[in-house]
């Protein structure tokens, strides 16, 4: 059985070199099924297969499809490791200020990561997850979206929020769980959410966001809204059953959604060689009928072009798209992880020194004459000052009142929750000296 794959390099933003396998149509309208059309075209079963579940030819030779003889999906890139544009027709020709925003967002995220990681090591916050090495996937994709597009993140997409101008003070407040935290201290650190910036609150269990994002995209389609949903996840989450359910629902219901997979090499401590045997995550898309592409995740322009084109077509065609961004997780999985137990220092240093997305974009800026060493020093100093000011403010704030543990779930608090709230109040009144209640809002 062979699947029809069309590799269509086009020009400019529309190249995005998408692997096509699916149906096109008008947004918001149902389309006829190709299998039904074929049944009308072929009156004899001897002419063509007419099974409704697949499109294929009959063969008279017994042969199993071998996964290792199918050529791998290529990796789309725009600039090389030296920051040089490879094919001028693929240059997105972004204005200087926008590219500088890319760079400032990526480096500001990197600075915030370093400070919050160290603060966890000092016992100031309970947990943290860095984004080292994956900054290009965040910023490149976020820049290609409209501000009203709905984002479902996993737990390593802080750069998407940062590009949407989420305040540093709220990043810090969430990690500290203080009174300014929109979640009122009830979420783990790095589990951000912001309704005003259309960023759905992050949930810890892997892949739960995938079918939820498909439901949101289906709702957008039903409303005929000019928006899409983007759903981020890692290659490890793609092994969860929710990923299969989400992909299949999106394809069969024809939802305007971008599945954005950050393939960073590891699912916590499990390398990709032990996660799957096929050709990565992008290769799964055609099996579901999803248009797919693999991009260099360390090339912010490749990520931007692919996401921009996928968004345009998702809106126009009411179709799902899958982007697999190949990158590398330079940091530990989290502050609860020690990656030296399962990978070498040389491996990490290679990606940090030889193919870092920030270094590549900086080199591009230097090549263009848009950045120099003096600006670099000044910005590094300024960005650290901004992060430290927000950090110190968040640390001084009180924690939310413990009674808020029970609020914001039901419109009217049920009797059982009221009893639990009253029980906690009595407990703290009796044994309050054993708790740091002076750190909490009264």
Swiss-Prot record:
Question: Which residues of the sequence carry a binding annotation for Mg(2+)?
Answer: 235, 264, 266
Main localisation: mitochondrion
**Positions where Phosphoserine occurs in the chain:** 334, 336, 344
What's the protein here called? 2-oxoisovalerate dehydrogenase subunit alpha, mitochondrial
Spell out the family assignment given in the record's similarity comment: Belongs to the BCKDHA family.
Catalyzed chemical reaction(s): N(6)-[(R)-lipoyl]-L-lysyl-[protein] + 3-methyl-2-oxobutanoate + H(+) = N(6)-[(R)-S(8)-2-methylpropanoyldihydrolipoyl]-L-lysyl-[protein] + CO2
Cellular localisation? Mitochondrion matrix
Extract the coiled-coil ranges from the record.
none
Per the record, residues carrying N6-acetyllysine are 353
Q: How is it modified after translation?
A: Phosphorylated at Ser-334 by BCKDK and dephosphorylated by protein phosphatase PPM1K.
Pfam families associated with the record: E1_dh
Q: Which residues carry this modification: N6-succinyllysine?
A: 353, 377
Q: Name one GO molecular function term.
A: metal ion binding
Explain the purpose of this protein. Together with BCKDHB forms the heterotetrameric E1 subunit of the mitochondrial branched-chain alpha-ketoacid dehydrogenase (BCKD) complex. The BCKD complex catalyzes the multi-step oxidative decarboxylation of alpha-ketoacids derived from the branched-chain amino-acids valine, leucine and isoleucine producing CO2 and acyl-CoA which is subsequently utilized to produce energy. The E1 subunit catalyzes the first step with the decarboxylation of the alpha-ketoacid forming an enzyme-product intermediate.
Residue numbers binding thiamine diphosphate: 155-156, 204, 236-237, 262, 333
> Where exactly is the transit peptide annotated in this entry?
1-42
